[in-house]
Curated annotation (Swiss-Prot):
Transmembrane domains' residue ranges: none
One Pfam family linked to the record: Fer4_7
Described purpose of this protein according to its UniProt entry: NDH-1 shuttles electrons from NADH, via FMN and iron-sulfur (Fe-S) centers, to quinones in the respiratory chain. The immediate electron acceptor for the enzyme in this species is believed to be ubiquinone. Couples the redox reaction to proton translocation (for every two electrons transferred, four hydrogen ions are translocated across the cytoplasmic membrane), and thus conserves the redox energy in a proton gradient.
Localization annotation: Cell inner membrane
Residue ranges of every copy of the 4Fe-4S ferredoxin-type domain listed in the record: 52-82, 93-122
GO biological process: aerobic respiration
Protein name: NADH-quinone oxidoreductase subunit I 2
Organism taxonomic ancestry: Bacteria, Pseudomonadati, Pseudomonadota, Alphaproteobacteria, Hyphomicrobiales
Enzyme type, top EC level: translocase
Chain residues that bind [4Fe-4S] cluster 2: 72, 102, 105, 108
Subunit structure: NDH-1 is composed of 14 different subunits. Subunits NuoA, H, J, K, L, M, N constitute the membrane sector of the complex.
EC number: 7.1.1.-
Gene it is expressed from: nuoI2
Length: 162
């Protein structure tokens, strides 16, 4: 047996070095958070629950161009456009998103020329049935109304990178 190995085993050098390593981390602040009660800040580029936005005058932004429907790789978006109005604009009659199919890639948000469809900051939208994850136009507009302040702030922060 080597004298060096014998000295190491008698003096328990590995044990002592491991003990000091553990003690160094023991007295540091904990990196974990108590999730339901504490939350980390969310990035401005976070992609969560979908929402349809409105203009400040209350009119919906969607112009029924169907670019989001065309670009969606999961084919989760279904849009039906209404007839043209007197001023030449169109609006959607039906705007549905199947959140079960959605892969949250953000391509719909990037394709939209008027920032109508966005992925908001909400990530806590668990449901008990699959049918509740089929969002219609009314629910998407309600999400947009509920999260408008946070959505506008994240779009403003992300503007230099678009």
């Amino acid at each position: 047996m080597n004298i060096n190995a014998t000295a190491r085993s008698l003096l328990l050098t590995e044990f002592v070095s491991a003990f000091f390593l553990a003690m160094r981390y023991f007295f540091r602040p904990k990196p974990t958070i108590n999730y339901p009660f504490e939350k980390n800040p969310i990035s401005p580029r976070f992609r969560g629950e979908h929402a349809l936005r409105r203009y400040p005058n209350g009119e919906e932004r969607c112009i029924a161009c169907k670019l989001c429907e065309a670009i969606c790789p999961a084919q989760a978006i279904t849009i039906e456009a209404g007839p043209r109005r007197n001023d030449g604009t169109r609006r959607t009659v039906r705007y549905d998103i199947d959140m079960v199919k959605c892969i949250y890639c953000g391509l719909c948000q990037e394709a939209c020329p008027v920032d109508a469809i966005v992925e908001g900051p909400n990530f806590e939208f668990a449901t008990e049935t699959r049918e509740e994850l089929y969002y219609d136009k009314a629910r998407l507009l309600a999400n947009g109304d509920r999260w408008e302040r946070e959505i506008a702030k994240s779009i403003e922060l992300d503007a230099p990178y678009r």
